[in-house]
Amino acid sequence: MGLPRSGVLVFGLVCVFQLSHSSSDDDFTKVRAVNLGGWLVVEGWIKPSLFDGISNGDMLDGTQVQLKSVGLQKYLSANGGGGGNLTVDQDVASTWETFRLWRVSYREYQFRCIKGQFLTASNGDVISATADSPGDTETFYIERNNSMLHIKLLNGGYLQPGWDDGMATFEMTIVANNLHGDYQLANGLGPDQAMVVLTEHRKNFITGKDFYFLSKNGINAVRIPVGWWIAYDPNPPAPFVTGSLDTLDRAFYWAQIYGLKCIIDLHAAPGSQNGMEHSASRDGSVDWPSPANIEKTLDVINFLAQRYANNPSLLGIELLNEPSAGAVPLGTLVSYYKTGYQIVRSYSDKAYVIFCQRIGNADPMELYQADLGPTNTVVDLHYYNLFDPFFEKLNATENIQFIYNNRMPQVQALDKANGPLVFIGEWVNEWNVTDASQTEYQLFGKAQLEVYGEASFGWSYWTVRCNSVHWDYEWNKRNRYLIGGSPLESPKYMLLVAGCLLYLLFILT
């Protein structure tokens, strides 16, 4: 039996009312964001071509090398890992024989030991590993032929075991070359070329067209990683170059045009909070917890809050991205977060203040127990089925089950906790599964959208554009590897639209 015309009318009116008031529904007010990664904070894997023009590009800041005397067949070693003599007497290389490069120019380098001291020729021809900071006597000129090196001292002599001229050649082994961030790019290119490369990158990597695309695909916010040097524009400290502040202003302009909100994310803090390239670490060290660096970071938060607090597109400020659990003490972080909260509140009562969970072996509940602030606070969790040997063993079905069986209970438990809202600030539709089908990717993405959609604040996909296509949000949407995520694609919304169509048919017939 068909639905009476009166029933069609009532159903249609209800749908029209619900559709017109849908913006007040939780599904429409939660954050559905995309990160603008690799734009104002460089990550080489996102756009590798940025590094193409660097001479000796395999010897960037932070590259770890080991040096073996060709004549003696022994490794150069900093006894005790630094702080003492330098010898060439080890048959096998380990941490004492591994040095981190500080690049001065494409031919001049400083060598840092595992304990932090630098090789120095401060005593003339006697080389030791005793300098706490580098200068002229800690700078060595490299004569290179592929992996073979001569290391020239300031006085014109060469580093050579036993000071035998035939022993001056070392074979260099690159142990790790995994830092490709802002420091490596700008210092590797030099100030003039870095200005050219980064100006072009900031202008064209993300444009207003991307903001338009996001707005048309159900995204209502962007999370924008920035580096601490943005507060010093137009004259940031070397090697960083000017322009990131103007670009952030432009992002806020586009956001206002296309109806998006902005989360400013302090991704790179002075001294580095995690030793990774995306924190602009020079050599993998984590020096952020020092009082001087924390004070400098708070100055950056003050600058950002003061500049953008009254901008209608500001949604929130994230005080620090991914502090390391192994290097940043919880007490230090909590103290910083509380002070940062007060700074933001001094300019805005409405802006959300976002606290990122420590990465590594840390319980997200630790921030809920810290009483970081009374109003509009958010804890940011980053969920990847990557970066852990556990996930390497999982097939497609097991990855999807992990989202439902492990992530869902954690999100729900945190949602119920008495404290900040929950934000899945980074996640991606990528995994370690080889040869996965498009359907499997769709199911994996669907699971994440369903589970992370339960988070009380919302979620943010990493990232808008990337050289690795499954990390690229726009590629995923255009090629239908990621389906959903927009309220316009939800079953409830489709039902409302159907009701409206029925109502229109009723009044037109």
Regions found by a protein language model. Give the residues of each.
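C-terminal GPI-anchoring signal of eukaryotic secretory precursors
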Residues: L482-L495
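An active-site-proximal structural segment forming one wall of the substrate-binding cleft
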Residues: V196-N220, P237-H267, S279-G316, Y341-I343
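Active-site region of glycoside hydrolase catalytic domains
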Residues: F28-K30, G44, V175-N178, S272-V433, ...
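Lectin-like carbohydrate-binding module/patch detector with strong preference for beta-trefoil
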Residues: G57-A176
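Extended, alpha-helix-rich binding/interface surfaces that flank or overlap catalytic cores
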Residues: G458-W462, C466-G484
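N-terminal structural segment of carbohydrate-active enzymes
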Residues: S20-T63, T173-A231, N235-A238
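Structural signal for hydrophobic/aromatic residues that build the beta-strand cores
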Residues: V34, L76, L119, L159, ...
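Cleavable N-terminal signal peptides of Sec/SRP-targeted secreted and luminal proteins
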Residues: P4-S22, M494-L508
